[in-house]
Amino acid sequence: VCGFTYVHAHDSLWNIKTSDYHDAYYGTAVGNGGIGILPWKEPFSIKQIVLNHVFDAGAPHEVSRLIRGINPFSMNVKVDGQVVDGTHISGWEQCILLKEALHQTRFVYANKLEVSYNICALRSMPYAGLVQVKVKALAPVDLSVENGAEVPDEYLQPRIQRKSIQDYGLHLKLLRTSALTRHRNLQVSATSAFIFENDTKVEESDNKRNIFTKYLKTGEDFSFALLGAVCSQRDFIDPCNESDREVIYGAKEGVDRLMDLHLEQWNELWKGDIQIVGDDEAQRAVRFALYHLYSSARSGSRLSIPPFGLTSQGYNGHIFWDTEFWMFPPMLFLNQGIARSMMDYRTDRLKPACQRAFSYGYRGAMFPWESDDVGEESCPTFALTGPFEHHISADIAIATWNYYCMSRDIRWLREDGFPLMEQVAEFLVSRAEQNEDGSYSICNVVCADEYAEGVDDNAFTNAAARCALQDASKAAALCGIKAPVSWNAVAKGLRIPKFSDGVTREYEGYDGQIIKQADASLLAYPLKAITRPEEIKRDLLYYEPKIDKSGPAMSYSVLALQYARLGDGEKAYELFVRSFRPNQLPPFGVISEGAG
């Protein structure tokens, strides 16, 4: 508590600031790879807590959905009996400190009280968060602060318990709220406690919350902290007592120690930085993207990153191809510990992928389009992507080979990597059909361009399958295993459709329709299945105008990269900016999936 300082946003390349309280607002979460905390603009408001890879059904007999956690950080602050809300504040300002992973707010309430507070998800404690508050009285005031837990509606039977801890120099009033998820009866527990620099009496309010009061004279400063932890049965047999222990441990460590460890670990993460000279906008955008990736993952977790990270329940928190094709590569270069966890997520779920292939009449491993914690298909049944978007298995195998190429961990390749690649290769061989001319087709798929359903010989699906089969053969040789002849035969024989002028045809029968996102253009990069510059340029010129203007931003990023590789810096920059600027949301620049 005594270590609290409000860091001013003087470094515009690391800090993102807003001061218009009435502007449209899309919040930015703080996360530590275990929990995500989403602060909002109203004083002391936290919109939701997201728990990494903790799932319940979205509705009876529906697919799994990432759950919101019980929020132990809810505070009701009053000054002279009036609730501190957005109606009587001035000088409001929020700042996201990317380097420190802090969400800061400050304002003046009713010309009586200066308020500043930090919110962080503690990097050193993956199930815990900390709110640090500092106030200064501009006039004599009576301050009261009440803490309780907010229980989202996806829970049943919430139970509140209070406990006093007075031992080893600790004087804590723990407030624990536990409940069961509505459909799968998973227990979640959240515990919180106030921490003070000096003795301050905490009492029980009429509604079973913790509350303290403080009289402040003009000019008097006062600081306190609120430490909270959220645990679930996914990670603990006894989440109730564990959430208590986390808070007790953190309180005994002390706020200064917790923050030192938090900042130390974020400094280590930022050794994996991308530095851009001469373009402040691009520098902030790239660091903001890295911040979200680092906030959503951690080394050693054996977990991956969903499309919305730990900010929301978007796409139900499932794991898609986005992970291996778009999020994994920067982690592979910048933080191999996180990249390894993303690989562990897939190798840990090889068995259900094999069971899925078996259930559809194939050999090997058929990974789900949308994977939840157990690794089974979790795509809603109204979408054909679940049964038919089969390039996901090849994407995972390609990422597996890339991890080996970067890490050169031959033991991992033998024990974990190659077994996955082998099973994917067997699936792809069993999925391919031989034509009369000896070539091979993969029929009836959903393309990477998901507007195209039930088509044959999708260029990206077939090229990804070819790469996965070729990589599996290389891995087999390194492991001292002779690859089946069928792997090479199918890889060589897979059809890649072409127009008469040499442009890659997205699928057999494609005739220039609008596409959702890049598909055939991915053959040049990252698949590197097309290497001649004139062929790459033909595909770029043909497909860029075909991309739906409201489609995902990922298309323009990969087109920009290809133009850069061709040496066309001006066009590369145009598309690079287009990949994020139209998708930025106020006030911090959070990226939406679609433009506008």
Give names to the regions the model predicted.
Residues F55, N71-F73, A101, I392-A399, ...:
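Amphipathic, well-ordered alpha-helical segments in soluble domains
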Residues E268, G272-D273, V277, E281-S296, ...:
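Long, charged, mostly alpha-helical binding arms that flank functional sites
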Residues E281-V286, T311-D322, T385-D395, L413-L420, ...:
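Secondary-structure capping and boundary motifs in well-ordered enzyme cores
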Residues F288-S295, Y345-P352, P419-R431, C467, ...:
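Alpha-helical scaffold segments in carbohydrate-active enzymes
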Residues A297-T311, G337-I398, Y404, R408-E415, ...:
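Helix-terminus loop motifs that line ligand-binding clefts
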Residues Q423, F427-I481:
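Acidic/histidine-rich catalytic neighborhood
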